């Protein structure tokens, strides 16, 4: 192989290695093993065995702080089962704030078509009848044929359960009770697994709901220092399946050597005192990968200096780093949130989703983009979820009784957003002007 061919091959291998590792920092990535919660995984496996293998209707509750990996933990455990053996319905207390939507998703999984125009009460009643609830007519006519349903067990994941029940109103408690009640029909296997960052949420349930959660909740434990180191090593190491065995072994040997460096270990200990969640280390991984350069002999492979430089970068203003990491669309939505507040004469610091989406966001689309090609509402809500997870916005502690998306507001200094817009080179000029000129 000529020197040119070898150089091109090495460049290709480095690019491929970068892509593999960068993908591991995405929210959709699931590791082959879940470090630090092995005991908790066995408990969830037992629940899922009942739900999927034994086709029993069951409930489970996974608790842990925001960003602790509750949803990833569930998805990791679910990987054990063949996807053709169950149906999964995912609901979110943040996104699916419309009760009818939740019911229709569940009915769809059960193979039940809901007639249009039914209110919540009649929708529940319609589903119950379809599931085999005895009516006066069926009691009289015992020859009534039972409807055949989807034989696959249905697992319903409700993420951020506390947002569904935040208002603690009777209607919301009744909604959840009625959902759980659907699992008691003999001719269907319907199980509920909920995640929440509110560890004492069971104490907030009415007695009739609390009685359903007889087993102790699964608590995601904080990661130990050793677990964090193992996870980080796994994140930046190349897999056995990597194309070039020699390149993989050299890469992994450099990773092993670097992580044993005294200075790297000390930096890990300092950072661990502040952060013990995996997503806090994704920024470090991305910074390390960004600094690798085939043509720079000092940065050709991962080494202790590159890792320590990454820690130094993280020691900058954390807010500044987070704002740099936002996508252009996320930053645009953030600017719209700020301008929604500026453009209204309301005393309440919190704004509604409609004020943002149908107000400032649509106004921006018309004024700068000359069209109404906005992101869809579910996509916008997911962006708000991400901003909430990062702590850039916060929601009111209580949702309103109608089940609308909770009001929210900026939780950081607006000046930091303006400064970030000025310093980011990837933002369109119109967005920079929108944020820096409209807000000042």
Curated annotation (Swiss-Prot):
Q: Which Gene3D superfamilies match?
A: P-loop containing nucleotide triphosphate hydrolases
Compartments in which it is found:
Nucleus
User: Where does this protein chiefly localize?
Assistant: nucleus
Biological process GO terms, please? Answer: DNA replication initiation
Give coiled-coil spans as residue ranges: none
* GO MF terms held by the record: ATP binding; ATP hydrolysis activity; DNA replication origin binding; nucleotide binding
What keywords tag this UniProt record? ATP-binding, DNA replication, DNA-binding, Nucleotide-binding, Nucleus
Q: Which GO terms describe its cellular component?
A: nuclear origin of replication recognition complex; nucleus
Superkingdom of source: Eukaryota
Q: Which residues bind ATP?
A: 64-71
Self-association or partners: how does it assemble?
A: ORC is composed of six subunits.
The UniProt similarity line reads: Belongs to the ORC4 family.
State its role.
Component of the origin recognition complex (ORC) that binds origins of replication. DNA-binding is ATP-dependent, however specific DNA sequences that define origins of replication have not been identified so far. ORC is required to assemble the pre-replication complex necessary to initiate DNA replication.
The protein in question is named Origin recognition complex subunit 4
Q: Which organism is it from?
A: Dictyostelium discoideum (Social amoeba)
């Amino acid at each position: 192989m000529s020197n040119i061919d070898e150089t091109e091959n090495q460049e290709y291998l480095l690019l491929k290695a970068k892509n593999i590792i960068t993908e591991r920092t995405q929210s959709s990535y699931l590791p082959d093993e879940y470090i630090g919660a092995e005991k908790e995984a066995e408990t969830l496996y037992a629940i899922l065995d009942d739900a999927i293998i034994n086709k029993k209707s069951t409930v489970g509750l996974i608790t842990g702080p925001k960003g602790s990996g509750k949803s990833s933990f569930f998805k990791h455990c679910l990987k054990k089962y063949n996807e053709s053996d169950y149906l999964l319905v995912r609901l979110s207390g943040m996104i699916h704030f419309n009760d009818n939507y939740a019911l229709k998703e569940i009915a769809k999984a059960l193979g039940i078509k809901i007639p249009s125009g039914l209110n919540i009460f009649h929708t529940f009643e319609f589903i119950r009848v379809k599931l085999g609830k005895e009516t006066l007519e069926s009691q009289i006519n015992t020859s009534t044929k039972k409807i055949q349903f989807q034989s696959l067990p249905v697992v319903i994941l409700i993420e951020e359960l506390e947002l569904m029940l935040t208002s603690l109103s009777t209607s919301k408690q009744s909604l959840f009770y009625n959902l759980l009640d659907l699992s008691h029909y003999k001719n269907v296997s319907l199980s509920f697994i909920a995640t929440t960052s509110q560890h004492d949420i069971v104490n907030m349930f009415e007695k009739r709901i609390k009685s359903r959660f007889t087993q102790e909740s699964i608590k995601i434990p904080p990661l130990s220092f050793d677990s964090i180191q193992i996870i980080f090593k796994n994140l930046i190491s190349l897999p056995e399946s990597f194309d070039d065995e020699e390149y993989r072994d050299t890469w992994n040997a450099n990773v092993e050597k670097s992580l044993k460096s005294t200075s790297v270990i000390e930096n890990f200990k300092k950072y661990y005192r502040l952060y013990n969640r995996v997503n806090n280390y994704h920024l470090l991984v991305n910074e390390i990968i960004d600094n690798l350069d085939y043509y720079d002999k000092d940065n050709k492979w991962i080494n202790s200096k590159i890792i320590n430089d990454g820690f130094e970068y993280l020691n900058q203003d954390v807010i500044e780093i987070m704002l740099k990491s936002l996508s252009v669309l996320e930053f645009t939505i953030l600017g719209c949130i700020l301008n929604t507040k500026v453009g209204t004469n309301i005393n309440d610091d919190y704004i509604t989703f409609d004020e943002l989406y149908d107000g400032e966001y649509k106004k921006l689309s018309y004024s700068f983009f000359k069209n109404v090609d906005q992101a869809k509402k579910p996509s916008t809500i997911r962006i708000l979820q991400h901003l909430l997870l990062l702590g850039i916005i916060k929601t009111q502690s209580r949702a309103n009784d109608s089940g609308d998306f909770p009001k929210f507001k900026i939780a950081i200094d607006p000046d930091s957003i303006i400064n970030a817009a000025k310093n980011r080179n990837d933002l369109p000029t119109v967005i920079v002007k929108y944020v820096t000129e409209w807000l000042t």
